[in-house]
Amino acid sequence: MKKVDLHIHTVPSISDRDFFFSLNSLKDYVEKLELDCIAITNHNLFDKTQFEYISKELSIKVFPGIEIDLEAGHILLISENEDLQDFDLKCKKVTRLIKSKSDYITYEQLIEIFTSLSKYLLIPHYDKKPNIKVETLEKLGDNIFCGEVTSIRKFKACLTESDK
């Protein structure tokens, strides 16, 4: 079984409490949990330079990503490492649109910026606040095949409930 953490924050934004990122702490975390890969998913921003640095420093696969405030909920959008420049430009559009804690982008803006959602791994806050609205999940349709919960207990509960 592979161990992954696809929700790592490394840069504080307006959506976060202030924190200090430490590469050594990240290395310790990866080693202690024996992770096989991670994704860097800061709130509404992507720091390409920092991502490249972290990728070189870690011995595991690191995916580029962004956690987007989407229609008052949150969604992780994770990319391949193939065209970082294009991903960076798209993420900068999100950053320009979200200037305060109450700002978010619409589904239409998400499509306008990232065009082909099937190129990305999309992970909505499902049973975790701020969760994505059912209407937004329906719009995302087949592009969603997993969700994020806050605990192992909630994950196990979701596995046993057929309507989730």
Place the predicted regions along the sequence by residue.
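An N-terminally biased module of ancient metal coordination in phosphate/nucleic-acid-related enzymes
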Residues: M1-A72
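Domain-core and long-helix interface of multi-subunit machines
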Residues: K3-F21, T49, D88-K164
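Glutamate identity and glutamate-enriched acidic tracts
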Residues: E31-E34, E52, E57, E67, ...
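Ordered hydrophobic segments in well-structured contexts
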Residues: C37, I75-I78, L121-I123, C146
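Short, glycine/serine-rich, charged loops/turns that create anion-binding
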Residues: N44, E82, D127
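A basic- and aromatic-enriched beta-loop-alpha substructure that forms the phosphate/nucleotide-
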Residues: E67-S100
